[in-house]
C-alpha cells in the first residue's frame, strides 16, 4: 500500500518522469498510512476499555458536537470530490483529497476530541465521539479501497459487523450525502 500510494501521488500517474526514492516511501508511510492506522488503534483501544459496542443503536446517535458535524461534513465533501475525479478518470486528483483528509482526521478531529474519549463517565458526548469516529473510519475504508486495498480492508475487517460483507472490496463505493454537509461550519473550521 505504501508503494501504491506513493506512486498514485507522484508525477508517474500523469505520465511524467519519477525519481523513485525509498525516502518517499518512508514519508508516505509516516505521514499518511501510520496516522490512519493509529486512528483505528485509538478507536479500538478506547472502545474496548469502555466496553463500547458499535451496534446500530449506538451508531444512530445525533451529532450535536460541532467537531463531529465538521468531520462528517468533510467526509461527505471528500466522497463527492473523489467520486467526481474518478468519474473523470483523473486518478492523480482522486488521491490528493483523501491524503489531506487523513491529516484532518488525525491531526484535527482526534487531537481536538481526545478529552471526550478520555472522560470517565459514559455520557452522550463520549458515545457520540465513538459513533462519529467509527462511522468516519468505516466509510473512509470503503472510499480508499481502490487506492490502498490492504490497509482499507484491515480497517474494514476491524470495524465490520457480522451482517456486513466479508471484505471492503465487496462493499459498494460510498455515496456523498449532501444533507450531512455543513458548508458554513466547514468554512469556519478552515
Predicted regions and their residues:
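Conserved phosphate-binding loops in nucleotide/dinucleotide-binding enzymes
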Residues: 1, 15-31, 64-66, 88, ...
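Catalytic adenosine-cofactor/nucleotide-binding cores of aminoacyl-tRNA synthetases and other
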Residues: 1-62, 160-164
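Non-catalytic, well-ordered alpha-helical scaffold segments
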Residues: 1-5, 26-41, 92-99, 103, ...
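An acidic- and aromatic-residue-enriched active-site/binding cleft used to recognize and process polar
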Residues: 8-12, 23, 91, 99, ...
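Core structural elements
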Residues: 8-10, 31-44, 50, 65-78, ...
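Short, charged/polar, low-complexity loop and linker segments
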Residues: 11-19, 77-89, 120, 175
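Conserved short loop/turn motifs at secondary-structure junctions
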Residues: 21-25, 98-99, 122-129
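Acidic, turn-prone loop/beta-hairpin segments
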Residues: 50-80, 111-190
